[in-house]
Amino acid sequence: MSYIEKKGNIFNSKAMAIVNTVNCVGAMGKGIALDFKLRYPEMFKEYQKICFQHLLKPGQILPYKKSTPIILNFAIKDDWKDPSKVEWIEETLQKFVNNYNRLGITSIAFPWIGAMNGGIPLETIKYLTRKYLSDLDGIDIEVYDFDPDAPCVLYNTLKDIVEANALSPSELEDMSDIKARYWVKIIDAVKDSNTKSINNLCHYIVDGKRIIGKTNIERLFDFLTKYNKGIYIEPKSLF
C-alpha cells in the first residue's frame, strides 16, 4: 500500500478514516479539533460526554464510526491548557498500528499530530509519524501538512452560492439563522480574491475586527453541510 505526505486540507481526503487530535476534558476550541467540532457536531457531543465521565485518558484512541469518514480521536493531551507529551503521541500511534486491521481501516488521513497546538517540535512529530506509519501493510496513509489557503467542499459550496447570486442576504438569513448584515460581509469576503478557504474567511478582518464570530461560524458550517445534503430551512413563504 502507500504512505504519502502532502500539503493541503485534510478534509478533502477520500480516505475511509481521518484522525483528530483531542484533549481529555471535552474541549475542541482551537486548531484541527475545532474544525472537527464544526463539521461533525454529533461526534463532538459523544466525545464530550465520554470526557465528562472521565473515561478518556491520554494515549487512548476514541473511534467515532457514525460518520463518513470514520473519525479516530487521538487523545494526545490531558487538559487543553497543557502541552502534549511525546509518550502520549507514541502510545496513540502504537495503538493505531496494533488495531487498524481489526477495525477494517484500509485508508486513513493524518495531520502532523501534536505539531500545531501540542507544543511538540515538528521534526519530532515527523520522525515519530514516519517511524510508526511509513511501512504498514494493507493500508493507504496520507499525512497532511495544513495549508490555510486550501479550499474544501464546504467553501466551494459557499463560493458557488455567492457567484450564482440567486439568493439575497435576507433569503440566506431565513435559511441559516445568520443575520442578513453578516451575510453581506461574508459575501464581500468571498468575492475578495485573497479569500481562498473557510480558514481565510474565519480570519477575515475588516476595520480591525473579524467579520464573523464563533456563533455565526457554527451556523455557517451547519448551513453549508445541510445545503450540500439538500437539507436546510426553506426561505419563508411569501403568503
Question: What spans do the regions from the language model cover?
Answer:
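Macrodomain-like recognition of ADP-ribose-binding/processing modules
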Residues: 1-239
